[in-house]
UniProtKB/Swiss-Prot annotation:
Its cofactor is Co(2+); Mg(2+); Mn(2+); Ni(2+). InterPro entries: HAD-like_sf (IPR036412), HAD-SF_hydro_IA (IPR006439), HAD_2 (IPR041492), HAD_sf (IPR023214), PGP-like_dom2 (IPR023198). This is Phosphorylated carbohydrates phosphatase TM_1254. Displays high phosphatase activity toward erythrose 4-phosphate, fructose 6-phosphate, 2-deoxyglucose 6-phosphate, and mannose 6-phosphate. May have a role in the intracellular metabolism of many phosphorylated carbohydrates. SUPFAM superfamilies: HAD-like. It comes from Thermotoga maritima (strain ATCC 43589 / DSM 3109 / JCM 10099 / NBRC 100826 / MSB8). The keyword Phosphoprotein does not apply.
Length: 216
């Protein structure tokens, strides 16, 4: 293997519960309920596509601009209070670097938000290549973000390992020709859906290091 590619939210960081809480608070402010099923519909999807989905599903009668502003304010509040890295992730990143294997990030999160979180947790330093959601025209499940990462890494899909926690992310990697995709499971995603999308196996964040020791 020549490279390892990580998604960010839900894989490197325990962020999905934070997204859920932020969206729940915003939905509640409109008098609407927010469910885990609805949250799964937008997991791994770029915000520019996810917010209109939420507005329609919640039947929110407001401008997208106002809704987006409220979401950003709530996300900033929640993330500043509760952001933390997933257990075992730093050790996994250190292991990859010790093997002199390239590390890349492929996240649907916009660059400014993503870098703020990576720097807060001191994780940015590990990555050779980073591609963000606002740097591609088509978000996951379109393969564009993974094709761009592969191009910047200058590696072929057969020489890459991917860790993703969303159905759309697994589908994106699969469509880019990558086969060795591990589905990272947590409290807010659906492991069965990850396998159906093409993940070769399911792992918890703290198990990523052991997987890497086997495949690298």
């Amino acid at each position: 293997m020549e490279a390892v590619i990580f998604d960010m939210d839900g894989v490197l960081m325990d962020t999905e519960p934070l997204y859920f809480e932020a969206y729940r608070r915003v939905a509640e402010s409109y008098g609407k309920p927010y469910t885990e099923d609805l949250h799964r519909r937008i997991m791994g999807v770029p915000e520019r596509e996810g917010l209109p989905i939420l507005m329609e599903a919640l039947e929110i009668k407001d401008s997208l601009e106002n809704f987006k502003k409220r979401v950003h304010e709530e996300k900033k509040r929640v993330f500043s209070e509760l952001l933390k890295e997933n257990p075992g992730v730093r050790e996994a990143l250190e292991f990859v670097k010790s093997k002199r294997i390239k590390l890349a990030l492929a996240t649907s999160t916009p660059q400014r938000e993503a870098l703020e979180r990576l720097r807060r947790l001191d994780l940015e330093k590990y990555f050779d290549v980073m591609v963000f959601g606002d740097q591609v025209k088509n978000g996951k499940p379109d393969p564009e973000i993974y094709l761009l990462v592969l191009e910047r890494l200058n590696v072929v899909p057969e020489k890459v390992v991917v860790f993703e926690d969303s159905k759309s992310g697994v589908e994106a990697a699969k469509s880019a020709g990558i086969e060795r995709i591990y589905g990272v499971v947590h409290s807010l995603n659906d492991g069965k859906a990850l396998l159906e999308a093409g993940a070769v196996a399911l792992v918890k964040p703290e198990e990523i290091l052991n997987v890497l020791k086997e495949v690298l």
